[in-house]
Amino acid sequence: MLFRGRSHRSLDPKGRLMLPPDFRDILMSRAEGGKLVLTSFDDCVMGYPLPDWEDFERKFSTLKNPSRKMRDFRRLVIGSAELMELDGQGRVRISRSHMDYAGITKDVVLLGQGSRFEIWDQGRFDGIVTQDFDDVAAELADSGIELSL
């Protein structure tokens, strides 16, 4: 099962976010107790089921002689990772540091991204969807992916 779709949500006053039912089901099926890792990157908060995150960390640790930029990336992404667990109501708490990084105040958009999901501030996400994506079709075609909608 993969994370798919978009959902608009609001954080409660304690910074907790109610995940969509299908996201909760995926977390519960892939991680004992619904454990997940939240990290910051790309102007949003990313959520991974714990086993998927651990696999990512293992792969990352096998890099031979990583560049300074790669080490800085690791500092940002792995250094900001926080182990979380869904509460009894299917909520996850978003830390202040993640909220600050992603510009999250209250209203958010959750986006399924396959093996992970992203949590975006509503305003930042609105800026993404208004972009012109005409050049993306050519980039996909260069990668052997035809997007025929």
From Swiss-Prot:
Annotated Gene Ontology cellular components are: cytoplasm; nucleoid
Q: Which domain of life is it from?
A: Bacteria
Entry annotated with the keyword Zinc: no
Give any GO molecular function from the UniProt entry: DNA-binding transcription factor activity
Per its UniProt record, what Pfam families does this chain match? MraZ (PF02381)
Span of domain SpoVT-AbrB: 6-52, 81-124
Instruction: Describe its assembly.
Output: Forms oligomers.
Q: What is this protein called?
A: Transcriptional regulator MraZ
